[in-house]
Swiss-Prot record:
<comment type="similarity">
    <text>Belongs to the peptidase T1A family.</text>
</comment>
<dbReference type="InterPro" id="IPR000426">
    <property type="entry name" value="Proteasome_asu_N"/>
</dbReference>
<dbReference type="GO" id="GO:0000325">
    <property type="term" value="C:plant-type vacuole"/>
</dbReference>
<feature type="modified residue" description="O-acetylserine">
    <location>
        <position position="214"/>
    </location>
</feature>
<dbReference type="GO" id="GO:0005634">
    <property type="term" value="C:nucleus"/>
</dbReference>
<dbReference type="GO" id="GO:0048046">
    <property type="term" value="C:apoplast"/>
</dbReference>
<dbReference type="Pfam" id="PF10584">
    <property type="entry name" value="Proteasome_A_N"/>
</dbReference>
<dbReference type="GO" id="GO:0005829">
    <property type="term" value="C:cytosol"/>
</dbReference>
<dbReference type="InterPro" id="IPR001353">
    <property type="entry name" value="Proteasome_sua/b"/>
</dbReference>
<comment type="subunit">
    <text>Component of the 20S core complex of the 26S proteasome. The 26S proteasome is composed of a core protease (CP), known as the 20S proteasome, capped at one or both ends by the 19S regulatory particle (RP/PA700). The 20S proteasome core is composed of 28 subunits that are arranged in four stacked rings, resulting in a barrel-shaped structure. The two end rings are each formed by seven alpha subunits, and the two central rings are each formed by seven beta subunits. The catalytic chamber with the active sites is on the inside of the barrel.</text>
</comment>
<feature type="modified residue" description="N-acetylserine">
    <location>
        <position position="2"/>
    </location>
</feature>
<feature type="modified residue" description="O-acetylserine">
    <location>
        <position position="220"/>
    </location>
</feature>
<comment type="function">
    <text>The proteasome is a multicatalytic proteinase complex which is characterized by its ability to cleave peptides with Arg, Phe, Tyr, Leu, and Glu adjacent to the leaving group at neutral or slightly basic pH. The proteasome has an ATP-dependent proteolytic activity.</text>
</comment>
<keyword id="KW-0963">Cytoplasm</keyword>
<dbReference type="GO" id="GO:0006511">
    <property type="term" value="P:ubiquitin-dependent protein catabolic process"/>
</dbReference>
<dbReference type="GO" id="GO:0000502">
    <property type="term" value="C:proteasome complex"/>
</dbReference>
<dbReference type="Pfam" id="PF00227">
    <property type="entry name" value="Proteasome"/>
</dbReference>
Length: 249
């Protein structure tokens, strides 16, 4: 890619002759090298899961979180550079607080997504800035029900039934398309997301990983929370069993 973009990849404000902005493509590459992040919208809420690759065996479990609460009713899962992700999470929290202080009500998920996407896009407009090397999945529950958005390094934001980013995104999207999300509960969704992440993890090539999951549903009183430990362990067991059965076949 660098040889193709030589001369046109020095600034985020420079277009190549065929209309590409290489700095944004490089930022997207940082996302594609990250662990897989999956988000699905079930009939009663949102489930998000992250394949959090463990950089060192000396790291304590739970370190370097990839899923963050940005408001009582909204959470964000990050793929790509963790430090860049923290900046986007901080901005999302700030926007949620600002909206609530002005209007006296929780920020709608669509409004929050648009504000964060505008901030991400801002970093693609000026030569002294660089694009964020991360993508995020934003899930929330508001008066319109559960909603799921994905924001890319270019600053675009779309609403999804199911979304995936990271190195296994294409295979994850294929698996998500097989699910009947409109009839699936969040409890069932937790198990399905765990199965997808375990299935896509390549033990021969990838580092060990920790499964991080959260949800927003009736079970959590429509608040963004970590998936309870007992359900998370059940999901891990189901995922490993499904993987063993697949290998046996």
């Amino acid at each position: 890619m660098s040889s193709i973009g030589t001369g046109y990849d020095l600034s985020v404000t420079t277009f190549s002759p065929d209309g590409r902005v290489f700095q944004i493509e490089y930022a997207a590459k940082a996302v594609d090298n990250s662990g897989t992040v999956v988000g699905i919208k079930c009939k009663d809420g949102i489930v998000m899961g992250v394949e959090k690759l463990i950089a060192s065996k000396m790291m304590l479990p739970g370190s370097n979180r990839r899923i963050h609460s940005v408001h009582r009713h909204a959470g964000m899962a990050v793929a790509g550079l963790a430090a860049d992700g923290r900046q986007i999470v901080a901005r999302a929290k700030s926007e949620a607080r600002s909206y609530e202080s002005v209007y006296g009500d929780a920020v709608p998920v669509k409004e929050l997504s648009e504000r964060v996407a505008s901030y991400v896009h801002l970093c693609t407009l000026y030569w002294w800035l660089r694009p964020f090397g991360c993508g995020v999945i934003l899930g929330g529950y508001d008066r319109d029900g559960p909603q799921l958005y994905m924001i890319e390094p270019s600053g675009i934001s779309y609403r999804y039934f199911g979304a995936a980013i990271g190195k296994g995104k294409q295979a994850a999207k294929t698996e998500i398309e097989k699910l009947n999300l409109s009839e699936m509960t969040c409890k069932e969704g937790v198990i399905e997301v765990a199965k997808i992440i375990y299935k896509l993890h390549d033990e021969a090539k990838d580092k060990a990983f920790e499964l991080e999951m959260s949800w927003i549903c009736e079970e959590s009183k429509r608040e963004h929370q970590k998936v309870p430990d007992d359900l998370l362990e059940e999901a891990k067991t189901a995922a490993k069993t499904a993987l063993e059965e697949m290998d046996a076949d």
